[in-house]
Amino acid sequence: MKVIFSVAVLVLASSVWTSLAVDFILPMNFHMTGELLQKTKALCIKNIQLCWILSYFKVSEPICGSNQVTYEGECHLCSGILYEDRTVIKVHDGPCEHSSDESEH
């Protein structure tokens, strides 16, 4: 009985954690500024390691970048900033209205 209870608690705890697991929060703005880009980059550097963990538990929600590209989530936007030297910030949650997919760029 103790084993079943322990497994049930473990499953419940991981389910709750997974449902609460969200990509980290990035600032949003329609106008790019150097200060906002630096703040976004600093948050990306601080949180990029979470992306590996989050990718196993949760599908990311699309976000719109200031370059009118729809990214698969904050992790993908940060990857572009940190590893592809893109100058982009998050504009809003959800896909861009007139966008090409991030994978095309």
Curated annotation (Swiss-Prot):
Coiled-coil residues: none
GO molecular function list: serine-type endopeptidase inhibitor activity
Signal peptide: 1-21
InterPro entries registered for this protein in UniProt: Kazal_dom, Kazal_dom_sf
Keyword vocabulary terms for this entry: Disulfide bond, Protease inhibitor, Repeat, Secreted, Serine protease inhibitor, Signal
Cystine crosslinks: 44-78, 51-75, 64-96
Keyword Cell division: no
Superkingdom of this protein's organism: Eukaryota
Site (Reactive bond): 53-54
Tissue distribution of the protein: Expressed in epydiymis, in the cauda, corpus and caput.
Domain Kazal-like per the UniProt entry, residue ranges: 44-98
Keyword field contains Repressor: no
GO CC terms: extracellular region
Pfam families: Kazal_1 (PF00050)
Subcellular localization: Secreted
Protein function: Probable serine protease inhibitor.
Protein name, entry field: Serine protease inhibitor Kazal-type 8
